[in-house]
């Protein structure tokens, strides 16, 4: 249905993209029992709490620089196989520290995976360093400082993820100031678990060019108009939203309504195998379920490239491929 279309992804958590087959091999390598979390080639969870447990258990089997190179390469190879030309991966140097690998080795492994994948298929990728709300403002500021001083050409953006209900967006504004001053692109998770107010708070406190999810802005039509007027880009992940119960079904999902209202929207997969989806499926949903034609889908893909955290030369080259 969309196999002939070029694809771009702006919102995907690296550990959340771990292919089940690779995770199973990694678990065997380290002698880790993941039978409760991985059955018949699929990740198993039944509510948000068990999703987090499953996610953490899967992350446990990626431990070394080479493990992260392999994970990154494998996912980007999968994307390249469906004609994806660009991917932004959400990564957490804090996670690298927590598992004892270290932030630098964690990032180095991921960058090596990007290099290997690009060498094979030409796929471009960049990294968005994320702070995690549930670890508090100081931790998030530390993540921003790491991204700012890394001087790594593949680190081009900064994000805030984690539990949306932990603190006000304003509590984390300093981290975004640090990232902005370093020339990093800004995006933030909002309007997913929490309502439209969290999107408004993000616009007020952070002034991001993009918002991760943002779909619950639909609950406030004045806010929808504001998003359209500002040109703020939403990184929308329909499969994730349904899997987590943000909306009960695709018929009630606001992707089409947001786009028709003039909001700049893009398509991503979030944590694809955990939500039994993929970027390929998300594009197919756009066509088959939401009724977008090829030209409309290409327009969303161009929007993603226009909003990507890349230099102008790379952006121009990517746009030429659509």
UniProtKB/Swiss-Prot annotation:
Coiled coil: none annotated. One of its GO terms (molecular function) is adenine deaminase activity. Its cofactor is Zn(2+). Pfam families: A_deaminase. CDD domains: ADA (cd01320). The keyword DNA repair does not apply. InterPro entries: A_deaminase_dom (IPR001365), ADE (IPR028892), Ado/ade_deaminase (IPR006330), Metal_Hydrolase (IPR032466). The keyword Metal-binding applies. Its EC number is 3.5.4.2. Binds 1 zinc ion per subunit. It catalyses: adenine + H2O + H(+) = hypoxanthine + NH4(+). The active site is at residue 192. The record marks 213 as: Important for catalytic activity. Keywords: Hydrolase, Metal-binding, Nucleotide metabolism, Zinc. It is an enzyme of class 3 (hydrolase). Zn(2+) binds at residues 11, 13, 189, 270. Substrate binds at residue 271. GO terms for biological process: adenine catabolic process; hypoxanthine salvage; nucleotide metabolic process. Catalyzes the hydrolytic deamination of adenine to hypoxanthine. Plays an important role in the purine salvage pathway and in nitrogen catabolism. PANTHER family: ADENINE DEAMINASE. Belongs to the metallo-dependent hydrolases superfamily. Adenosine and AMP deaminases family. Adenine deaminase type 2 subfamily. This is Adenine deaminase. It comes from Rhizobium johnstonii (strain DSM 114642 / LMG 32736 / 3841) (Rhizobium leguminosarum bv. viciae).
């Amino acid at each position: 249905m969309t196999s002939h279309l070029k694809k771009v992804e702006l919102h995907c958590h690296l550990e959340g993209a771990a292919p089940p087959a690779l995770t199973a091999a990694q678990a065997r390598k380290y002698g880790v029992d993941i039978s409760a979390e991985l059955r018949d080639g699929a990740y198993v969870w039944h509510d948000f709490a068990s999703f987090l447990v499953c996610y953490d258990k899967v992350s446990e089997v990626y431990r070394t620089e080479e493990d992260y190179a392999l994970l990154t390469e494998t996912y980007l190879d999968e994307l390249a196989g469906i004609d994806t030309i660009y991917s932004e991966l959400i990564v957490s140097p804090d996670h690298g520290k927590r598992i004892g690998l270290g932030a630098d080795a964690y990032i180095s492994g991921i960058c090596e995976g990007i290099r290997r994948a690009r060498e094979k298929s030409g796929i471009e990728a960049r990294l968005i360093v994320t702070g995690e709300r549930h670890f508090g403002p100081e931790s998030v500021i530390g993540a921003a400082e790491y991204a700012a001083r890394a001087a790594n050409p593949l680190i081009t953006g900064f994000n805030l993820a984690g539990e949306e209900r932990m603190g006000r967006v304003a509590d984390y504004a300093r981290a975004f100031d640090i990232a902005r001053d370093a020339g990093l692109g800004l995006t933030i998770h909002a309007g997913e678990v929490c309502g439209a107010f969290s999107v408004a708070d993000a616009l007020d406190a952070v002034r991001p060019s993009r918002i991760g999810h943002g779909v619950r802005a639909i609950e406030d039509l004045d806010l929808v108009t504001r998003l359209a007027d500002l040109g703020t880009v939403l990184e929308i992940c329909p499969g994730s939203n349904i899997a987590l119960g943000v909306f009960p079904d695709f018929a009630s999902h606001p992707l089409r309504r947001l786009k028709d209202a003039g909001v700049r929207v893009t398509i991503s997969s979030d944590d694809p195998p955990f939500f039994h989806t993929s970027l390929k499926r998300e594009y197919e949903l756009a066509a088959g379920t939401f009724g977008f034609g090829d030209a409309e889908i290409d327009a969303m893909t161009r929007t993603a490239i226009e909003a990507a955290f890349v230099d102008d030369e790379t952006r121009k080259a990517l746009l030429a491929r659509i």
